[in-house]
Every structure is written in C-alpha cells, then in structure tokens.
C-alpha cells in the first residue's frame, strides 16, 4: 500500500472521534470550520498539496459569505502567514540561484512538487531581473497520482519549458532525476519522523550535483494552530533551526545556513553540497 506521509488522519469520522472523546464543543467548531475551503481541505485530506497551495495563493474562498470570511481569518493567522513565508523563501532562493547562473544549463527540482508555484514564480522573478533561462530544465517529483496533470498545467501557464514530472517516493533515491543543481522541498519535513527526514535529506543529497543547493523548511509550535491541527488529526513534527541544521550536516552537506521567517515560526534551511 502506498504511504502518503502527509495523510495522518486515522479516524474514519472526525465528528464521531470527537464525540467518543466527549469533545462536544469541538464538534460544533468542526462543522463551522468546514465552511472555509482551507479548513475543509485540511479536515478531509490532511496536509494535501491543495491545502498548501491555498495558503500560497492567499485568496479566501468558502461556502458563502461566512465561509469566505472564515477562510480569510484562517489565512490571516500567524501560522498561515508563516506557512506562506516558506513558499516565498523558496521562490526567492530559486530566483537568486537562477540569476547567479544565468544562461547556464541547469536542472531544478521541486519535491514533493504538488502545484509547483515556487518554481513558476521563482523563474518569473528571475526573468524580470534579466536572467536567461533557455537552458534550464524544471522537474517535479511527487507520489500523488493526481499531481502530474495539475502540476503540468501550472507549469505550462507559468512558462516553465521544459517541465518534467516524475512520480515516486521522495524518500527513495531511485525516484529522483539526476544530477540536479537546485532542489526545493517545503512542506513534507513536518510529516516525517527523524529517521524518515534523514532518508529524505540523504536522497536529495545524492541527487544533487557537487556544488548544488537545497532549500527546505521546518516549523515550530504555536498554540492555537496546533489545537486546530489536532482537531483535524494532522500530526506534525516540530523542529528548530539547530535540529535541521545538524541533520543536514549529518548527511554530508558542507555549507548549511538557517534563518527564521519574519514571524519566527518557520525555519528556512539553505544547504550546499
């Protein structure tokens, strides 16, 4: 059976699970939250690519005026704004990399790619700064069979040409195109235990060309957001900058830098092979 690391929900029915634990007020909150497209996606499909892309786009939507208002309030939470900051960090790191290597033959990978918005917007930002990307090949790797078609549509609309999709497990080195020059991986780490995260970092390290760059992230706990995640049975692993930096060094990365986003919830990792 294929294991989707971000699908952490175990209960067949969240309302029934809440009822069995006598969390009666949270049953009402559950049905209220479902009016928001963001919350409904999280409740139904855990940390899906659609959940992440909704935050990255930042456009409120939901069932009627109440749903849209509720969605806007959820998107305005510090945890959601910080979640979007990791996308912006990956976009900006990619744009800088493409500008520094303008005109070179490069391979750039997003894993798991979902909707590869950081590639699309990073490339667009680099072009606006004058970078020449004619020899850049963009890649997406994802385990979800729904992703290739949706990722390709996004890539084509964003003028990523060529964009090559690879379906496979991000923790398996055999899934990767290689060698690649730049890898972005945000959003998967928090669903992995330490051993699994080591496997992910190792697979990415093996796929990178010598001198290649890896951009990733981790997040820290915030009370209200953690409470909402628990209602949805979204089980995540929180890590600080020291932990992910040490792990990156342990798999062989020679240059490792970490920084906090402006809200100090997300930690951004930039590592070079």
Report the location of each language-model feature:
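Class I (Rossmann-like) S-adenosyl-L-methionine-dependent methyltransferase catalytic domain
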Residues: 2-25, 55, 65, 74-110, ...
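A short His-aromatic
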Residues: 190-192
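A short beta-strand submotif of the Rossmann-like class I SAM-dependent methyltransferase core
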Residues: 184-188
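A short glycine-rich, Lys/Arg-flanked "PGG" loop and its adjoining helix->strand segment in the class I
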Residues: 198-213
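Short acidic (Asp/Glu) and glycine-rich catalytic loops that position anionic groups and cofactors
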Residues: 30-34, 182-183, 223-227
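A short acidic, Gly/Pro-enriched loop at the edge of an enzyme's catalytic core
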Residues: 174-183
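N-terminal, positively charged/glycine-rich alpha-helical extensions of SAM-dependent methyltransferases
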Residues: 15-73
């Amino acid at each position: 059976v294929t294991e989707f690391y971000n699908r952490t929900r175990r209960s067949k029915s969240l309302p029934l699970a809440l009822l069995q634990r006598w969390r009666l007020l949270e049953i009402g909150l559950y049905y209220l939250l479902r009016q928001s497209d963001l919350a409904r996606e999280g409740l139904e499909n855990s940390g899906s690519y659609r959940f992440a892309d909704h935050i990255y786009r930042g456009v409120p939507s939901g069932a009627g005026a109440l749903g849209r208002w509720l969605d806007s309030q959820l998107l305005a939470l510090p945890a959601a704004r910080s979640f979007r900051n990791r996308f912006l960090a990956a976009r900006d790191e990619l744009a800088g990399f493409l500008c520094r290597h303008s005109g070179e033959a490069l391979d750039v990978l997003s894993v798991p790619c979902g909707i590869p918005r950081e590639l699309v917007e990073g490339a667009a930002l680099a072009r606006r700064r004058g970078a020449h990307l004619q020899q850049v090949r963009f890649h997406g790797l994802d385990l979800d069979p729904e992703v290739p078609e949706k990722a390709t549509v996004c890539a084509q609309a964003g003028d990523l040409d060529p964009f090559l999709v690879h379906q496979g497990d991000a923790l398996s080195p055999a899934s990767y195109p290689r060698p690649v020059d730049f890898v972005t991986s945000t959003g998967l780490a928090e669903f992995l235990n330490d051993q699994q995260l080591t496997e992910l970092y190792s697979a990415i390290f093996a796929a990178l060309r010598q001198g290649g760059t890896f951009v990733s992230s981790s997040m820290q706990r915030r009370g209200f957001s953690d409470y909402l995640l628990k209602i949805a049975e979204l089980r995540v692993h929180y890590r600080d900058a020291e932990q992910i930096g040490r792990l990156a060094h342990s798999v062989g990365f020679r240059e490792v830098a970490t920084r906090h986003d402006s809200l100090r919830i997300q930690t951004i990792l930039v590592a070079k092979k």
